[in-house]
């Protein structure tokens, strides 16, 4: 499988940013990072305010779309590229936070914008149980189990591109050279579809 554009995914705490940076360095590829930090609708002043979840979700969706279009216009995807997010995953958070009326509007906008987004050649989904994610994030958010389950459900049914599911419970998230070499071998052996990979314990 020729992988010029690889997207790394997983819930926060799965280690996607670190892996994306390591892969980009090893492959001499451009690194694309999610730019949705600084969302003005996620501050404490907006928590619980009617419509704030919808505003926050649209901010993320439009920001990711703008970044993707800028990259495509710059012909970045003709070169080796590693991203720490998949545009399609925006829907995971939308279905977690929006009500039915908001989802109806969101879905129509998403359908329009997604047509202009370049699909990766391969998605790598970093998977781990809730208790592992919670320990890594030092997070007591009661919604975390629902979010992790939403990611698992989304990628269980994901068919848009080849998908490599990596079980990360027992690995060193700094991705030392040996672990990265093993992962790259798995990527090179991909022939499309969906495959599961449990790395050797490197923690």
Q: For each predicted feature, which ranges?
A:
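Pre-Walker A (Motif I) flank of P-loop NTPase domains
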Residues: 2-5
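Hydrophobic anchor at the beta1->P-loop junction of P-loop NTPases
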Residues: 8
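P-loop (Walker A) phosphate-binding loop of NTP-binding proteins
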Residues: 11
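Conserved substrate/cofactor phosphate-moiety recognition/catalytic segment
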Residues: 21, 25-63
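A basic- and aromatic-enriched beta-loop-alpha substructure that forms the phosphate/nucleotide-
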Residues: 64-101
């Amino acid at each position: 499988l020729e992988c010029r554009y690889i997207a790394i995914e997983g819930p926060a705490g799965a280690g996607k940013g670190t892996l994306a940076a390591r892969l980009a360095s090893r492959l001499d590829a451009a690194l694309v990072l999610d730019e949705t930090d600084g969302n003005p609708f996620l501050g404490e002043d907006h928590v619980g305010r009617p419509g704030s979840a919808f505003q926050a979700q649209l901010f993320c969706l439009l920001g990711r779309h703008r970044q993707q279009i800028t990259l495509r216009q710059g012909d970045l995807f003709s070169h080796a590229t590693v991203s720490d997010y998949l545009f399609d995953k925006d829907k995971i958070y939308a279905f977690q936070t929006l009500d039915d009326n908001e989802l109806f509007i969101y879905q129509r906008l998403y359908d329009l914008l997604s047509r202009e987004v370049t699909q990766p050649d391969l998605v790598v989904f970093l998977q781990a149980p809730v208790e592992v994610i919670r320990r890594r994030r030092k997070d007591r958010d009661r919604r975390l189990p629902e979010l992790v389950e939403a990611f698992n459900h989304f990628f269980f049914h994901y068919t848009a591109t080849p998908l490599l599911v990596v079980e990360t419970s027992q690995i060193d998230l700094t991705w030392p050279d040996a672990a990265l070499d093993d992962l790259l071998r798995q990527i090179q052996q991909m022939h499309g579809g969906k495959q599961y990979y449990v790395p050797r314990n490197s923690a």
